[in-house]
Amino acid sequence: MTAQTTPERRPDHLTLALPKGRIMDDAIALLSQAGLPLTRPEASRALRHEFPGVTVLELRNQDVPVYVDLGVADAGIVGKDVLLEAGRPVYEPVDLHFAECRLSLIREIGASGPIARVGTKYPRAARAYLQERGIPAEVVKLSGNIELAALTGLADAVIDLVQTGSTLRANHLEEVDVLFHSSARLIVNRTALKLRRERLRPLIARLRELTAPAGEES
């Protein structure tokens, strides 16, 4: 028995991949400002939401670049941290300037010994950072509560996202270095950019206008 294929979509229909949670709410608000007929979906178990000319797929953060890269979604919104970790060759035309944070190397306050093991949800970024600095540390991939790895001795340091730093201060931890700053980005499938250019290029242009820093509007 062969698997069913998704019916071919019209060139004027967009499929968008958005991450669940706060980013999705902010993304829908911004996309609505940009002219798409979107509203926040009502609470339900539905994972696909239909609007006039637009389908929204509600995904886990890490899956957004996959759906866009493989062409199931024409475009999506995802954090730069997730995008770099995924390593998918998607087009990234707009920094949307929300969901801002930073990926940092974190240790217990006052820790000064060598770093032999690092815990993180971002092994790709961690290995690149450690290799660049010549630190021969083992990288342990973790899924949540990353700070505990430093507090319990599982790791000598952790690499994790930081927004306000309040969680670090509450747990006697500090940032030692910043790997990079992250924010939400619009990503686009490269083939879709050609096939649906009449929908995607005006959307990209409008989002650039809406998110341009003061004094840089086109």
Swiss-Prot record:
One of its GO terms (cellular component) is cytoplasm. It comes from Deinococcus radiodurans (strain ATCC 13939 / DSM 20539 / JCM 16871 / CCUG 27074 / LMG 4051 / NBRC 15346 / NCIMB 9279 / VKM B-1422 / R1). Pathway: Amino-acid biosynthesis; L-histidine biosynthesis; L-histidine from 5-phospho-alpha-D-ribose 1-diphosphate: step 1/9. Catalyzes the condensation of ATP and 5-phosphoribose 1-diphosphate to form N'-(5'-phosphoribosyl)-ATP (PR-ATP). Has a crucial role in the pathway because the rate of histidine biosynthesis seems to be controlled primarily by regulation of HisG enzymatic activity. One of its GO terms (molecular function) is ATP binding. Lacks the C-terminal regulatory region which is replaced by HisZ. Heteromultimer composed of HisG and HisZ subunits. The keyword Transferase applies. Belongs to the ATP phosphoribosyltransferase family. Short subfamily. GO terms for biological process: L-histidine biosynthetic process. It catalyses: 1-(5-phospho-beta-D-ribosyl)-ATP + diphosphate = 5-phospho-alpha-D-ribose 1-diphosphate + ATP. This is ATP phosphoribosyltransferase. Keywords: Amino-acid biosynthesis, ATP-binding, Cytoplasm, Glycosyltransferase, Histidine biosynthesis, Nucleotide-binding, Transferase. It is found in: Cytoplasm. Its EC number is 2.4.2.17.
